[in-house]
């Protein structure tokens, strides 16, 4: 969605900033919803094909996310770079920067391909059941071919978002869903003359969908008048290692930060899985609901990155802080709604997922824990987004490491496994880690933004 770069003079500046950020964030939130729906469709198709297929796709998807987090996080630095160039009136520099980001995305896509090729032979050593390994291997071997397309797609997406144009994220997200659902069904079950591929079919459908989305985005950028002046594809340009190195210096810490947070939740799920099927199922329900709630602050944080970066580029430190506070205001409101829904409706929500009384009872309790971390989760992701807009990424990386792996994971494992508190203990660790990250990231933005504001004072 396109939004104005400046606020109307007749409108109070803060209220206008809230509106601008909200309009910018809405397509991003809906884009994340489409991603969640793709995961839902994968599970439905696989689940109806068979328990073994569902288990294979679940394992394969979890392993797919690990190599995805670092490239996606690394490339998101392009959003802040582009937004700052737009704010500074230096849009001529965006085309060359984008072409170097494409080279970087090619390398990151190749690394994804290599990881997904190397992991399947190791599955038996991870304790994966022997009957699941073949299906998970087939899924990973198929989906790996979409790795380069995925990184190209996110490179183009972050360019577009940095230009204050977020509508393609939503449209291509739902477009991908429309491609994946029928294609996954046909290839998984073997319909319309195609062979039945099971879990491999979903991997093939996912890879094809990634390429369709990437090609569609490239055609849009090439043909759109909105981007014509950037001359994105007018000529070939070899890699310039200095420019790529600058992108990595800003982006790689973001990728590691995203991996630290994502890894916390992945390892927590694995540890809870050791406690039993009831505990694992209850945790999966609670974490799925939490992820749905998280889509809103994540989209607002991405919009805040753009707004903060634009203010930095135009040399407006007060506007930079106003953009961040607008993001905080939106997130505090949305998280209050999410927490209230979880507190008041946790039993009803669980009833949608399961009829198993033991699973429902535990999941209902875990949703109360999820309600508790709505505010710290929203604040930490918003603070991280604001810091990305400042291109302040190295210190936040260490703050994330300390919060999630120095505090959250040790405490969760100690309480959940060491003291026998079970999933509740692990979730206390999640709450502590997210709360520590929220406090430290918030203080970091406060410190950095105040320094920039003071430095700009006459």
Swiss-Prot record:
GO molecular function, one term: antiporter activity
Presence of the UniProt keyword ATP-binding in the record: no
Keywords for the protein's UniProt record, in alphabetical order: Antiport, Cell inner membrane, Cell membrane, Ion transport, Membrane, Transmembrane, Transmembrane helix, Transport
Residues spanning the membrane: 21-43, 58-80, 101-123, 143-160, 167-189, 199-221, 251-273, 288-310, 323-345, 360-382, 395-417, 421-443
GO biological process terms, semicolon-separated: monoatomic ion transport; response to antibiotic
Membrane topology annotation: Multi-pass membrane protein
Superkingdom of origin organism: Bacteria
Keyword Nucleotide-binding: no
Principal location listed in the UniProt entry: membrane
CDD domains named in the record: MATE_NorM_like
Signal sequence extent: none
Family: Belongs to the multi antimicrobial extrusion (MATE) (TC 2.A.66.1) family.
Protein task: Multidrug efflux pump.
Entry protein name: Probable multidrug resistance protein NorM
